[in-house]
Amino acid sequence: MIIVLSPAKSLDYETPPHVSHHTLPQFADDAAALIDELRRLSPQQIGTLMSISDPLARLNFQRYADWSRTSTPANAKQAVLAFNGDVYEGLDARSLSPDDLDYAQRHVRVLSGLYGLLRPLDLLQPYRLEMGTRFTNARGKDLYAFWGERITHALNAELKTREGASRVLVNCASAEYFKSVKPKLLDARVVTPVFEDWKDGRYKIISFHAKRARGLMARYVVEGRIGSPDVLKDFASEGYAFDEAASNDDTFVFRRRAGA
């Protein structure tokens, strides 16, 4: 079973990693090709492309300039420890043991606009490039065109090493990022957990809570060494509970009320 996550825009390169073991991204050459194209943009063009402020545009202009084809612990950090958004607050990889991180290395993947597909311990240099960015490049009109079927083929290669019943992809990524995967080409069952909170008289997806819950689910899989999607239904972190009536074979719905 493999669980896929979205990356985070917020990054932490200040906190020293608690493990030294690291690996290198599979698609480093593709990332370098994108960086070469991004370096042609001015800060103003970056700001317009990404709809970000001038200071953020200048920051990322400099990040692209500083980016190196060679990633080392001196200029990069393990991806799961560098990402610092809502999902990663839920995952809280800094408190995972080395054994947990080794398990995550085999069972967790992060989709990335720049790197395509990352393992948790792959070295990540600072960047910003969301998958949905309409960045015209040598391969097409956007990043979905750039990555094509590469990410899907990479996932299939990993899924083929699993037992038949374990060929399950747990989609804990956002719609923007999972669009880079071609489910019809996957040699696996896809299960998507959905997290809803009670608000204004009904259950709804609240972005902040849902993102955090995806990270909590990934942590649950890692700490529990979970290999069966049915065991996902036992997830009960921070008040969420599986709702069988609202779920189906492909979508597992977890709900909670405030104060639960």
Curated annotation (Swiss-Prot):
Task: State the InterPro entries in the record.
Answer: YaaA
Family matches, as Pfam families: H2O2_YaaD (PF03883)
Full protein name: UPF0246 protein BTH_I1090
One GO cellular component assignment for this chain's record is: cytosol
Q: Which cysteines are joined by disulfide bonds?
A: none
Q: Which NCBIfam families match?
A: PRK02101.1-1, PRK02101.1-3
Coiled coil, from the record: none
